[in-house]
């Protein structure tokens, strides 16, 4: 069993430590996997497309620009991620349906909750490098998240 604290101790020079605080909404407090990315502004169509197409064990990282205008993830999209056996979702933005999300058996991190839904225009970008939390989120890098924080590495760190 790995912990981000132990990985930081062992691989300090080989990883990035996210400086942004997230709240945990999913059932899993600890999760890891290869990163896939989506960048959107108040529109979650590409989030849904990513969840429907990513391979098992992936962590979808969504950069919503920390917008407080709407939620980018709710119970319906989280159920898709759980059904497809994704490891987790990290949202630089907000979620809704939080009472249902706590029963979804994946990791879900976000800044907080917002009750209103996003627009559905399909605008945004997928599979690009993202910058938030003081780190670079690159597709196919590895992310590790638990109760102590979020770290990123170019290679798999746990055994």
UniProtKB/Swiss-Prot annotation:
Known cofactor(s): a divalent metal cation
Annotated positions binding substrate: 74-77, 96
KW Metal-binding (keyword) present: yes
Family from the record: Belongs to the class II aldolase/RraA-like family.
Role description: Catalyzes the aldol cleavage of 4-hydroxy-4-methyl-2-oxoglutarate (HMG) into 2 molecules of pyruvate. Also contains a secondary oxaloacetate (OAA) decarboxylase activity due to the common pyruvate enolate transition state formed following C-C bond cleavage in the retro-aldol and decarboxylation reactions.
GO molecular-function terms, A-Z: 4-hydroxy-4-methyl-2-oxoglutarate aldolase activity; metal ion binding; oxaloacetate decarboxylase activity; ribonuclease inhibitor activity
Designated name of the protein: Putative 4-hydroxy-4-methyl-2-oxoglutarate aldolase
Co-factor: note: Divalent metal cation.
SUPFAM superfamilies (UniProt xref): RraA-like
Highest taxon, organism lineage: Bacteria
A single BP term in Gene Ontology: regulation of RNA metabolic process
Annotated PANTHER family: 4-HYDROXY-4-METHYL-2-OXOGLUTARATE ALDOLASE 3-RELATED
Keywords, alphabetical: Lyase, Metal-binding
Organism taxonomic ancestry: Bacteria, Bacillati, Bacillota, Bacilli, Bacillales
InterPro entries: RraA, RraA/RraA-like, RraA/RraA-like_sf
Entry's EC annotation: 4.1.3.17, 4.1.1.112
Reactions it catalyzes: 4-hydroxy-4-methyl-2-oxoglutarate = 2 pyruvate; oxaloacetate + H(+) = pyruvate + CO2
Oligomer and partners: Homotrimer.
Binding sites annotated in the UniProt record for a divalent metal cation: 97
NCBIfam families: NOT-MenG, PRK09372.1
